[in-house]
Design a protein with these regions (language model features):
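Conserved interdomain hinge at the start of the Helicase C-terminal
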Residues: 70, 75, 154, 196-233
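Conserved helicase ATPase core of P-loop NTP-dependent helicases/translocases
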Residues: 113-115, 243, 248-271
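Post-DEXD/H (motif II) to motif III coupling segment of the RecA-like Helicase ATP-binding lobe
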Residues: 145-196, 200
Length: 324
């Protein structure tokens, strides 16, 4: 502070009052005002949620363990509720499932807005959560996304700020500790339910000629260009695959998924979007590459990313085991 006074005095003597005002006083006043507005702890940015008594149910498990299903069933039975997903496709599927069950559900993904004035439920991408609306039950899916450099803030915001007395968090095992720390920092109660995979996942010891794929195979690459290229190669060998990638229009993607589900297309080529909650009859996952561009750099896949995608093989109730 003494050093600041010396700087101010020197400016006053050399450049006059107007310079002191613009160079010293205004920036100091702005910093002081901002410090009063910014909470010392992120949880304190959500006073309405802090005033509630919330109970969290953590559904912890790998892919294909039924953890999301458990939370979703509770959501549909509640008078009001919200489902938060990492992908617009998952939010759309959640809305369709609830509407088919007679639950009046709106949709908000940023790209698609389908709002019913009389809705009791909302399906949305994590970023679109309203912090003003209260719900009886909230389900936040794929909570391991909290560690994502670009989108993790949305899961932090949802967990700290959602206005619901009962909150279900569905997450991979590696996210458990950070989720518990967040919940404990809020003073909320919690319980942990561990979901185990019922179908074994086996790692093959040899490479696969992808032009000799078998029914139920999913070929994974990490770009739209890669998906279209691999799909075209398969067509050249007389195999018509379904395709999935992030920018594919919903109606087109839905048709592709239905084609794979009903057997019209026996193979599927996809980006890592397939790892996020899309329940498809996949027998074997084939990685076409082990690197991806994450928005910043091209890097090797992380172990948890490999597990998330590979876990889609061996859908429960359809195949006795999965292969990768």
């Amino acid at each position: 502070r003494q050093r600041q006074m010396c700087i101010r005095d020197r400016l006053l003597l050399s450049d006059g009052l107007s310079t002191v005002w613009s160079v010293w006083y205004v920036p100091t006043a702005i910093r002081s005002s901002l410090s009063l507005l910014i909470a010392l702890n992120p949880k304190d940015e959500y006073p309405e949620a802090r005033a509630m008594r919330r109970h969290f149910v953590l559904h912890i498990g790998g892919t294909n363990t039924g953890k999301t299903y458990a939370g979703f069933q509770r959501l549909m039975s509640a008078p009001t509720g919200v489902y938060l997903a990492p992908l617009r496709l998952l939010a759309l599927e959640a809305q369709e499932t609830m509407l088919d069950a007679g639950v009046d559900c709106s949709l908000s993904t940023g790209e698609e807005e389908d709002i019913s004035e009389d809705d009791t439920h909302m399906a949305a991408t994590a970023e679109k959560l309203s912090l003003e609306r209260r719900y009886d039950v909230a389900v936040i899916d794929e909570c391991q996304m909290i560690s994502d450099a670009q989108r993790g803030y949305a899961w932090t915001r949802a967990i700290l700020g959602v206005l619901a007395p009962e909150v279900h968090l569905c997450a991979a095992p590696e996210a458990k500790n950070i989720l518990l720390r967040l919940i404990e920092s809020c003073g909320d109660t919690y319980e942990v339910i561990v979901h185990e995979r019922t179908t074994p996942l086996l790692c093959m010891t040899h490479t696969v000629d992808y032009t000799r794929v078998q029914p139920g195979d999913a070929l994974i690459t990490f770009s739209k260009v890669g998906v279209l290229s691999v799909a075209e190669d398969l067509r050249q060998h007389g195999k018509e695959p379904a395709i999935i990638y992030g920018a594919l229009p919903y109606s087109t993607r839905r048709k592709q998924m239905e084609g794979f589900l009903n057997g019209d297309m026996e193979y599927i080529v996809s980006t890592d979007a397939i790892g996020m909650g899309l329940n498809l009859p996949i027998r074997r996952i084939i990685f076409m590459e082990t690197e991806k561009y994450d928005g910043v750099e091209r890097r090797d896949l992380k172990p948890e990313e490999v597990k998330q995608i590979a876990g889609r093989a061996g859908r429960m109730g359809m195949y006795p085991r999965g292969y990768v």
